[in-house]
Amino acid sequence: MADPGNRGGIHRPLSFTCSLLIVGMCCVSPFFCHSQTDLLALSQADPQCWESSSVLLLEMWKPRVSNTVSGFWDFMIYLKSSENLKHGALFWDLAQLFWDIYVDCVLSRNHGLGRRQLVGEEEKISAAQPQHTRSKQGTYSQLLRTSFLKKKELIEDLISMHVRRSGSSVIGKVNLEIKRK
């Protein structure tokens, strides 16, 4: 029979058990993480949101870098691979803004809040909806538009700050480099 005054005997198995539990969680958790999806994988990306977010960011850029989405992404790749620190800073700022726009698009589509472009179906749906539902949706879409306009102003301000800091020659050099490739 164990001596009631000897508490070390009880303490050791508990600390050993806790240690095993912690080590087990650290070793087992990576196996569970493999089932999670990588949000940055292009095969998992929502192509409509990717395209619309790219177009939106491209339209906000003044002066215009490219007329196509692929040209815009060529420009982004150039900025990322450039060794100029200002190019890298501009890339990360634009990437963050793109990601914010993209995530907003994906979330709104997944939750049914995004605009659906269904020809003919839109009239049927709006006719079947009660009046109070339509007014709530109008308020929400107005909030989305306000949020979008604020983001657009933020992006334009950010881009103009980068252009002023580095001079417009940076944009010209970047455009020349892209055209050469």
From Swiss-Prot:
Keywords of the record, alphabetical order, are: Amidation, Secreted, Signal
List the InterPro entries hit by this protein, alphabetically: FAM237A/B
Q: Which GO terms describe its cellular component?
A: extracellular region
Q: What is this protein called?
A: Protein FAM237A
Signal peptide annotation: 1-33
Q: How is it modified after translation?
A: The active form requires C-terminal amidation and disulfide bond formation.
Tissue localization of expression = Expressed in the pituitary, testis, and heart and at lower levels in the brain.
Its biological purpose: May be capable of activating GPR83 via the GNAQ signaling pathway.
Q: Where in the cell is it found?
A: Secreted
- Which species is this record about? Homo sapiens (Human)
> Which domain of life, per UniProt?
Eukaryota
State the taxonomy lineage: Eukaryota, Metazoa, Chordata, Craniata, Vertebrata
| Broad class of where this protein is predominantly found | secreted
Positions of the pro-segment in this chain: 114-181
**Where are residues bearing Leucine amide located in the sequence?**
L113
Q: Does the keyword Cell cycle apply?
A: no
